[in-house]
Regions:
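Gly/Pro/Ser/Thr-rich low-complexity, intrinsically disordered segments predominantly at protein N-termini
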Residues: 1-192
């Protein structure tokens, strides 16, 4: 998410106005100065999210994994991303509007890849930068194209310093402040 705002299609304020008037069936994001349409999740996407939700509830009942949370991301919070999941303390988003700041409380952003043409750039390139620039401690990418989970952590100067990928079936360590291990054996049911 590096291009300067002078190359943006529109301002954040213009994006938010468009997003407010979009039908509920259309999910919009503003990533890297570009308006993005996020694919609607298929059944496997939803099942994988529910698997992760159960794991989070089991290991960290003090946290909520919020689906489809709108976050202010990138440098100076000039981007708007709608995560597949946002892990934060229970009650953290109480009173928040459509787009929440990530300045405190957001522990992890989660994306589950969709089968569309923009997945590579959006989930594997742009979002790791935007989430790191926003200071989100952990980014978990569940990649259905290559049956892996990638954990990004330790954001500094707009980049995650640590990146580790695991195949479906491995035990996946989520570092502090998340601080638990995922048993991913069940994800083999969704492998190619």
């Amino acid at each position: 998410m590096t291009p300067s705002t002078e190359y943006a299609q529109m301002s954040v304020e213009e994006f938010e106005e468009i997003e407010r008037h979009a039908p509920e069936t259309v999910r919009l994001e503003f990533i890297n100065g570009r308006l993005e349409v996020k694919a609607m999740p298929d059944g496997n996407h939803g099942e994988i999210f529910m698997w992760l939700l159960r794991q989070c509830m089991q290991h960290r009942p003090d946290l909520n994994l919020m689906p489809e949370r709108g976050l202010k991301v990138e440098k100076y919070r000039k981007g708007r991303a709608r995560t597949d999941g946002t892990l934060a303390p229970r009650g953290h988003f109480k009173g928040h509007g459509e787009w929440s700041s990530t300045d405190s409380g957001v522990l992890m952003a989660v994306e589950i890849t969709s089968h569309d043409a923009d997945t590579n750039r959006r989930d594997r390139v742009d979002k790791p930068v935007g989430y790191a620039e926003a200071g989100i401690p952990v980014y978990l990418l569940i990649d259905r194209d290559n049956d892996t989970l990638t954990v990004y952590s330790d954001p500094k100067n707009g980049k995650y310093q640590q990146t580790r990928s695991y195949p479906y079936g491995a035990d996946v360590e989520l570092p502090a402040p998340v601080g638990f291990t995922l048993d991913t054996e069940e994800l083999k049911d969704y492998a190619h």
